[in-house]
């Protein structure tokens, strides 16, 4: 079982993603914006971060860049989940350090596939022990 940090300023989006993460058998922690997400990630060191892009205080691109450049968090894979569906946004997100970029709305199966693919790559550390 992995512990996944979900960062989204929309309560309904947070709830929807939480349900999927729980259904996959993973634990979750949450943050309501990019700044809080960076703080929680540094403190809790989750196995993965699911990060919205359009948020107050620190957007998801900035938060991803911060996490990918910090020695204590650069090993944590970040999946950007956002309504921003332009190719330039996708490329920018990946350049900031995201391992994947998923546009909303997405299916439960699509999110599950991306999470499992990231956990099964050599770069990602194994999920935390339960």
Model-found features: residue ranges?
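Conserved acidic segment of CheY-like receiver
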Residues: 1-12, 17-21, 49
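Short hydrophobic/Thr-rich beta-strand motif most characteristic of the beta2 strand and flanking loop
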Residues: 25-32, 40
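Active-site beta3 strand of CheY-like receiver
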Residues: 44-50
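Receiver (REC) domain active-site loop signature in two-component systems and cognate sites
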Residues: 55
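Short, glycine/charged-rich "phosphate-handling" switch motifs in NTP-dependent
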Residues: 99
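C-terminal output helix
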Residues: 106-116
């Amino acid at each position: 079982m992995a512990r996944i940090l979900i960062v989204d300023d929309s309560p309904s989006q947070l709830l929807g993603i939480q349900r999927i993460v729980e259904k996959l058998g993973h634990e979750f922690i949450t943050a309501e914006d990019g700044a809080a997400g960076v703080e929680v990630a540094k403190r809790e060191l989750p196995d993965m971060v699911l990060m919205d892009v359009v948020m107050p205080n620190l957007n998801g691109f900035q938060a991803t860049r911060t996490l990918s450049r910090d020695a204590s968090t650069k090993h944590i894979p970040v999946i950007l989940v956002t309504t921003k569906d332009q190719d330039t946004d996708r490329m920018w997100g990946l350049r900031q350090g995201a391992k994947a970029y998923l546009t909303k709305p997405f299916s439960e199966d699509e999110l599950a596939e991306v999470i499992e693919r990231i956990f099964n790559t050599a770069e990602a550390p194994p999920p935390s022990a339960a």
